[in-house]
Design a protein with these regions (language model features):
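Conserved catalytic/coupling modules of large nucleotide/cofactor-utilizing molecular machines
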Residues: 1-166
Length: 166
């Protein structure tokens, strides 16, 4: 008996997805039990978006005008997919991974697309590691209990009075 399995797809790899893990077919029996509460809630939210997007993508191909909620789900799916891409032999600290995965649920990325993530992901990572206004957010990730707490904290960085509004 195994603890789970990862399903890799060559088609995803050919589209630039690295690692090319098919989330919908990959299973972990203990993964959620070993995650902290924040990561667990955020991963649930991400799986819901990816699942909803998979259902909507077929329908969206036949419609020229999509409802705003459908557009939001499909945009979030594209952002999440781009965020999940990672260069070989690179490490991203857990706090930054959590922040990156929360960003599609903030207003910061509401009008951005996957090209923005592709271009600016390294800049965003660097900012959360070194910018004095953002480092406290990075350090606080391990103390947060919910994804909503993190999203509110990230939203607060957009306020005009804040030293660094991304």
């Amino acid at each position: 008996m195994t603890d789970g399995h990862l399903m890799f797809k060559a088609a995803m790899r050919s589209q630039g997805q690295t690692p090319a893990i098919d989330i919908s077919l990959s299973v972990s029996r203990v993964g959620r039990q070993t995650q902290d509460r924040l990561t667990n809630l955020l991963s649930t939210k991400i799986r819901q978006v990816l699942s909803a997007a998979a259902d909507l993508e077929t329908v969206s191909r036949f419609s020229s005008e999509l409802p705003a909620e459908t557009q939001l789900i499909l945009r979030r799916k594209d952002l999440i997919t781009e965020i999940l891409k990672q260069e070989s032999l690179t490490a991203i600290v857990k706090q930054i991974q959590v922040i990156l995965l929360a960003l599609p649920f903030t207003t910061f990325l509401q009008d951005k697309n996957k090209t923005f993530i592709e271009k600016y992901k390294p800049v965003i990572i660097e900012a959360f590691l070194k910018n004095p206004a953002l480092v406290p957010i990075t350090k606080s990730v391990s103390k947060l209990q919910t994804d909503e707490e993190l999203i509110k904290l990230l939203e607060a960085t957009k306020k005009p009075h804040h030293k660094f509004a991304f």
